[in-house]
Amino acid sequence: MQVENMSFDNLLASLDKGDFDIVLSAMEATPERLENADFSDPYYTDVPPAILVKADVADQYKTLADFNGKSVGAQTATTKLDLVNDIEGATPVALASVLDLVNELVYDKVDAILVDGGVAQQYADANPDLVIAEASAELGEAAPYCIAVQKGDPKGLLDGINAAIAKMTAENKIETFIADADALADVAVEVSA
């Protein structure tokens, strides 16, 4: 197995070109993505998405309406950027990586960032200057993550992927993988904070 690390916004285009066989990157099977790829059964659902803000101004952001006229960052080509685009009056700022987004927030280049809930919690836990805005409660539930394959599954991978997901789910291995990944992410967040 070979793992390729690339920016999120290029994943489905590279998959379509055949640069790799699957995309395993916390990707949600949205209607738009289903036009260009096929998806496995869900393997994990994160906590709901969240908006990170600076702690000293958190009381200004009780509802999504409070982001009118504010710059809100999100990762390029993600459903979180779609959510930012839906916040009336907010100015979306799209960047390639979550770390870049956090740095923009820390250095006052954006007013807020919208990321996966688990990611937001890790950064808030590691950095007392960042908190999850109360307005996050209005964002709704998280969508489940799935594995993407080329449209039409020309390599016949989905049946095996779905069988592996079912087996790992039954054996609680996915939860173990998530816990291990969260522990590693906590270390990475502490180093970057």
Language-model segments: what does each one mean?
Residues M1-A26:
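Extracytoplasmic small-molecule ligand-binding "clamshell" domains
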Residues E28, D46-V102, G117-Q121:
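Bilobed "Venus flytrap"/periplasmic-binding protein-like clamshell domains
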Residues E35-T45, P49, I132-A137, Y145-A148:
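A structural signal for short loop-to-beta-strand junctions that line the ligand-binding cleft
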Residues L15-D16, F67, L105-V106, I147, ...:
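Hydrophobic residues within well-ordered alpha-helices
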Residues T79-P92, V131-S136, N162-A193:
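Ligand-binding clefts/hinges and TM-proximal coupling segments of bilobed small-molecule sensing domains
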Residues D16-S25, K70-S71, V106-V115, V119:
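Alpha-to-beta junction loops
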